[in-house]
Amino acid sequence: MAKLIVNFSALLMIILLVSNGLPKAVAQTCFKGEAQEGVCVKVDGSKLCDLLCRATNTTWFGACEVEDNETHCHCYGPC
């Protein structure tokens, strides 16, 4: 009976640790820089922005964002 309680407690601890760590790993992204100018104003600019950032580093992604009334391609990746 004691062995069953220990095994059950160990299983619960593993589930707790795994479920607690996953959202943090996915949510942590940091600004890595800007891609080529004028990318976001073109047709399918957001796709091109994403491709340019991924070409720099495969773990990065790109997003077109407005900054100082201009649209820029910003690259983000893991911190």
UniProtKB/Swiss-Prot annotation:
The keyword Secreted applies. One of its GO terms (cellular component) is extracellular region. Keywords: Antimicrobial, Disulfide bond, Fungicide, Plant defense, Secreted, Signal. It is found in: Secreted. GO terms for biological process: defense response to fungus; killing of cells of another organism. Its main location: secreted. Disulfide bonds join C30-C79, C40-C64, C49-C73, C53-C75. Residues 1-27 form the signal peptide. Belongs to the DEFL family. This is Putative defensin-like protein 203.
